[in-house]
């Protein structure tokens, strides 16, 4: 079983069409990985599906980096 961090990075790479090794914890979806607003919405939806959770819009707006996504999932698992 892969870790939450590995799973988040894999989803980010798939959704944004970048190589997994380019996805760093500190990477900003928009500034570093080239995401636009639609990409970020689709990314949040993919995270919700993968981790079987619902991310409210006000929380989703705060998830702007890979680490923020990892932290959110870690805090809301279980």
From Swiss-Prot:
UniProt GO cellular component terms: cytosol; membrane
TM ranges: none
Pathway annotation: Lipid metabolism; fatty acid biosynthesis
PTM remark: 4'-phosphopantetheine is transferred from CoA to a specific serine of apo-ACP by AcpS. This modification is essential for activity because fatty acids are bound in thioester linkage to the sulfhydryl of the prosthetic group.
Keyword field contains Nucleus: no
Chief localisation class: cytoplasm
Localisation per UniProt entry: Cytoplasm
GO molecular function, one term: acyl binding
Residues annotated with O-(pantetheine 4'-phosphoryl)serine modification: 37
Annotated InterPro entries: ACP (IPR003231), ACP-like_sf (IPR036736), PP-bd_ACP (IPR009081), Ppantetheine_attach_site (IPR006162)
Gene3D superfamilies per the UniProt record, alphabetical: ACP-like
GO BP of this protein: lipid A biosynthetic process
UniProt protein name: Acyl carrier protein
Organism per entry: Pseudomonas entomophila (strain L48)
Gene name for this UniProt entry: acpP
């Amino acid at each position: 079983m892969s870790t939450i961090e590995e799973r988040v990075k894999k989803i980010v790479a798939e959704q944004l069409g970048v190589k997994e090794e380019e996805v760093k914890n500190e990477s900003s979806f928009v500034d570093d990985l080239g995401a636009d607003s639609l990409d970020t919405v689709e990314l949040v939806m993919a995270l919700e599906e993968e981790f079987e959770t619902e991310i409210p819009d006000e929380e989703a707006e705060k998830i702007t980096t890979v680490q923020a996504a990892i932290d959110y999932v870690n805090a809301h698992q279980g």
